[in-house]
Amino acid sequence: MAKTIKITQTRSAIGRLPKHKATLLGLGLRRIGHTVEREDTPAVRGMVNAVSFMVKVEE
């Protein structure tokens, strides 16, 4: 089974760049405190890196 990471949204998307809002939706995050589990791939890591100030990552 592929390694997964837990991603939790910690800050609001209100007033953010449209690109950042789209990245959050691409990760499946909809609201503050929402947690999703995603495969640990370079694509997902890149998305997390783009909005790192708005999310928390657990290995």
Swiss-Prot record:
Coiled coil: none annotated. One of its GO terms (molecular function) is structural constituent of ribosome. One of its GO terms (biological process) is translation. One of its GO terms (cellular component) is cytosolic large ribosomal subunit. Keywords: Ribonucleoprotein, Ribosomal protein. InterPro entries: Ribo_uL30_ferredoxin-like_sf (IPR036919), Ribosomal_uL30_bac-type (IPR005996), Ribosomal_uL30_CS (IPR018038), Ribosomal_uL30_ferredoxin-like (IPR016082). CDD domains: Ribosomal_L30. It comes from the Bacteria. Part of the 50S ribosomal subunit. Belongs to the universal ribosomal protein uL30 family. This is Large ribosomal subunit protein uL30. It comes from Salmonella typhimurium (strain LT2 / SGSC1412 / ATCC 700720). The gene is rpmD.
